[in-house]
């Protein structure tokens, strides 16, 4: 007898080997129809998988995350099936699942056109409607190589040839198409109903620029029609909010071909940058951080000690001078330890908090660059806390509360918390890991946060908390981090004198709130669709005249506004052009300015202004003092 244990703890007995599909059918016809795969322990398997021993089993349906993964994987194969039907000369390569979808790479004699994509998607729908069974078979490696060579699929043959000779490989067939794959897959093509092809891009075979350029077709697939429509709507909204488009339209920044992956900030964009940086500088100052500044170029011997030269060298920009090798720093941490090591530190000095707006460089591949979100040169609000194990809980609790306040001030209220715990390969004692993991979790509980645990996802040198923002259209951005580090102080020989008079290693806490300022500003632009809160807006007020008769009055208003607030000048422009007032209002509205002040003869005579708020809201005529009170309240409340 074989005993199958279901998720609710109940058991079912079978006389002999049984498939996942048969177990599902024994539970109910509805479940049998909905079954996409099975999960035995942590392994997801086909519904045709035969269970030969006592096992725990859950039936995977479209409602499960694993089910969605199977749908997307299978839809990638359906895409390849459709391409081979329409373009028999095309060669198939690989087709993995990615976030929110999948892609498949093809080798073909000409680029696919938008019309081709529409035809491929239509053919996919037709093949899905046939509800053809998806059948798995296993071949010895050499036989599989010969099989795909016989089909003229040289890329597939090359992939299989790289597999050890003693391994078998699995193939999946649907209709007239068969593909190499580990699986699992849906039981039939009829399970694939809600998908859309998105775009075509270039991709080098095996990611190597020396190889052939392939065509990568991207698609998305979902469990329901509603989810697909929601996703497509989110993409439409994201396109409107694209920081690259808004950065150009609002004259904030540009990326130039003369320096790929680095940002040229325009005056208005640099004003926004300065507002973010100066705000974070006040956060440092008000929370016990000492701001420091380290050099950008450091000798390779330092990077050898930290392990970066061995593990991360390909992502570092290097140079040579006087027979010494140097690297542009990809991170600030080693520099902060070198500062910590200057002079003797006592336990009374701990916790010691350093903060730096450190400029870092990482040699990201060109294909991975994305506006100001993914760059090669960036500045971090990088902080490091040197402390003892006993300090970790209090420091993490204070940091989480601070992070929540900062995110709220920037307009983010939805934060996802995740604790990444010890991996198998790690340094440090179990006692130290127990203490650190407990401190991270307790700090989140003390802050009233619900959190996920990601077992084994911590770094080899310590556990961490990841803080992820959820934006206005549901996208997630991992920005904040609190990383415990037992390793780097050891590698770089950092010490403090303990209460016992002996030498001790400090624990190092790596922390960032906004992370890369470039990326965070990109997130801000997209979160607010360019309509930044008043306190961040590069231009807060535009003063417009109706006729030349109000020019001097408008200049007078602008001058008063620039001096209206103590310790803070309002950012004001005047527009005195001889243009229709409706034209000028529209132009400044498109720049998403918080306020537009209009002055005609009536306003001039009354010593007042007509106020228009963003979103075409007419607030009527008010005195200049009343307007100053209004905008001061906006700035103070960070709206």
UniProtKB/Swiss-Prot annotation:
Residue ranges annotated for the TGS domain, each copy included: 1-61
Subunit structure: Homodimer.
HAMAP family assigned to the protein according to its UniProt record, in alphabetical order: Thr_tRNA_synth (MF_00184)
Key words, A-Z: Aminoacyl-tRNA synthetase, ATP-binding, Cytoplasm, Ligase, Metal-binding, Nucleotide-binding, Protein biosynthesis, RNA-binding, tRNA-binding, Zinc
Binding site for Zn(2+): 333, 384, 510
Designated name of the protein: Threonine--tRNA ligase
Record note on cofactor: Binds 1 zinc ion per subunit.
PANTHER family from the UniProt entry: THREONINE--TRNA LIGASE, CHLOROPLASTIC_MITOCHONDRIAL 2, THREONINE-TRNA LIGASE
Cofactor: Zn(2+)
Molecular function in Gene Ontology: ATP binding; metal ion binding; threonine-tRNA ligase activity; tRNA binding
Keyword set includes Cell inner membrane: no
Organism: Acidovorax ebreus (strain TPSY)
Role, per record: Catalyzes the attachment of threonine to tRNA(Thr) in a two-step reaction: L-threonine is first activated by ATP to form Thr-AMP and then transferred to the acceptor end of tRNA(Thr). Also edits incorrectly charged L-seryl-tRNA(Thr).
Biological process according to GO: threonyl-tRNA aminoacylation
Region (Catalytic) residue spans: 242-533
Its EC number(s): 6.1.1.3
Catalytic activity: tRNA(Thr) + L-threonine + ATP = L-threonyl-tRNA(Thr) + AMP + diphosphate + H(+)
Signal peptide range: none
Domain of life from the UniProt record: Bacteria
Cellular localization per UniProt: Cytoplasm
Pfam families for the chain: HGTP_anticodon, TGS, tRNA-synt_2b, tRNA_SAD
Family assignment from sequence similarity: Belongs to the class-II aminoacyl-tRNA synthetase family.
SUPFAM superfamilies cross-referenced by the UniProt entry: Class II aaRS ABD-related (SSF52954), Class II aaRS and biotin synthetases (SSF55681), TGS-like (SSF81271), ThrRS/AlaRS common domain (SSF55186)
One annotated Gene Ontology cellular component of this protein: cytosol
Enzyme class: ligase
Gene name of the record: thrS
Record InterPro entries: aa-tRNA-synt_IIb (IPR002314), aa-tRNA-synth_II (IPR006195), aa-tRNA-synth_II/BPL/LPL (IPR045864), Anticodon-bd (IPR004154), Anticodon-bd_dom_sf (IPR036621), Beta-grasp_dom_sf (IPR012675), TGS (IPR004095), TGS-like (IPR012676)
